[in-house]
Amino acid sequence: MSESGLKEQITGKVEKAKGQVKEGIGEVTEDRKLKNEGKWDKTKGTIKEKVGKVKQKISDGLDNKE
């Protein structure tokens, strides 16, 4: 199991959650900049999470061949 893949997935989930909070606060306060930052953080989090999943699948595949 890829430890770095799992770490990347967790980091991505945290980034997504942070983005959701920022986006929500931006929505309530009508702060477009904060809302857009939140959307960007969510996007980065999603990408990190998917990269982590790919790393983990690759690592698991390599572990099975050994």
Swiss-Prot record:
Cited InterPro entries: CsbD (IPR008462), UPF0337_stress_rsp (IPR050423), YjbJ_sf (IPR036629)
Domain of life: Bacteria
Pfam families assigned to the protein according to its UniProt record, in alphabetical order: CsbD
Matches recorded under PANTHER family: UPF0337 PROTEIN YJBJ
Residue ranges, annotated region (Disordered): 1-22
Organism: Bacillus cereus (strain ATCC 14579 / DSM 31 / CCUG 7414 / JCM 2152 / NBRC 15305 / NCIMB 9373 / NCTC 2599 / NRRL B-3711)
Protein name: UPF0337 protein BC_0999
Family in the record: Belongs to the UPF0337 (CsbD) family.
Basic and acidic residues compositional bias, start-end: 13-22
Signal peptide: none
Disulfide bonds: none
